[in-house]
């Protein structure tokens, strides 16, 4: 039997003392768990009700689709996210739709989400020697507080986001692997594989954490044949649990799209209803090796668009890097001294040190994979908790001989991060608490009972409204994060839905007019007609419904039609005394005349945009998206293409080609005259530098030298 597998037997004189220590540790564990949950509940209450972009865009709708088959009547209703595995959002949907007050719903979610702090505590205990119980508990408590001091984690307590929930599966899986280092066994490996497989199935971005967990397996204190067998058991359990969770949804995706992971992996399965170019979010990826090396320190600064859309400064990664460098120097110094004056040490490595080394190596691999795949901090919550454990463990080891200095260092770092949380962090929008359900929606009988086909316009789909309309209604987002066109494979599906629902066709759009509470006609309709015209439709402003969103964005939604009287809820809220947003749902009818000049100008726009994409494929990807039309009465046609991988939008108008970055803002970048691109393809110098995309047209002389 391996020495690590042996069960220690305590002498009789030490047994009572060990029992007392065990009882004390158990009571402290309960206090830590209760404290973590209380903190999560307090944070959720202080932040308010989460009404962020993703909650309104697809979280609530995803939970709805997990329990209701929408494939026959909806089509990209919430954009491309409509077809991600929705089961993880089902609990939020059930709670929010139950009629419970929003505060109760958020409290339940926050309590469940606090489990990630429990797991961080348990993981920290595993990387400290058991012969130092006080230091072990103190370090674990500090690790929990450091795990909590994550702006992205704090922003999600009590929210609809699934990042924390799936991160709990990841941390639990890693915890079991670390425990297997102290006591190798089949059960730990199988359970870890199951947990990481479930996490990956529910949120594919967790695949990186499952892959890097294999590094931890290499640190098992067993012979190589046994390591390989344990690794195979881990992999089989992971694959089996992944398949079990994915299978029900994947069968539906395969039936409707020919891709069981649609829209992911479409380069492999090649469904004609989505681009075959891989979906990659380049927003937070480093643009150079220097930027990647600097990233731990960049994340410590209160800057936007580092690993989140909002400023989310986090000192843990800089601390971890500095502590790891100091630990390496200290180890080299001790090794040099030992070689000079001490006998050769034993080959046995303490189990806690081996566990910490495994955790550190696994984290380093995960960090590298994460930066190369997305760099999005929401996808790194599990590893952020593990980073807190590693960082605090290294600090405790560095200053083990000087506990007071260790306490000063920990307190200083905590104080600096607390200051960042207070003054440097931007928090998501949260609505104030009221004793009302999460979505307080009143729908007139007509909309609740008569099914219509709703066309949605815009990247923000506001799909949270869909479940409250007639059950057999259908929804299509024709112009969002993925543009749909009648001439492509998407067109056949849209045409079939139009035929089925005609003449019950509607368009749902946000009404930005200042006097929208007094007008039941259609808002500015040119952009909507531009989106509808390719499908042979136009807006009918004479037949509109009004959706009033009151008290924030939005704690209450009241829907009434032009022919109906407003509901009592709507009448009780004077528009002048409340903050109210409005949506209009207007009728859609077939077009009576087609603009003949539009097709000709579209061919010219497609020509120059195709040439632009071929000249700089790294910026404008995926290539060949749908070209959008925006009528301009003063300057003529305006054409645009949106590139989801880089979040750029290219405009062809006013004689010029230019692109904008809506997420980062700033002025438009001009990349040549339309006439020049029509005449011949142009050479470009393009890329991304310091987080900013650029493209410069190379002059003819420079182009000749370049050739």
Cite the ranges covered by each PLM segment.
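Membrane-interface transmembrane helices that cradle and orient dolichyl/undecaprenyl
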Residues: 132-134, 165, 171-189, 199, ...
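Transmembrane-helix motifs of polytopic, lipid-linked glycan transferases
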Residues: 94-95, 103-132, 172, 329-335
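Hydrophobic/aromatic-rich transmembrane helices and adjacent perimembrane loops
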Residues: 59, 156-157, 162-169, 199-204, ...
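Signature aromatic-anchored transmembrane alpha helix within multi-pass, membrane-resident enzymes
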Residues: 194, 214-215, 236-239, 243, ...
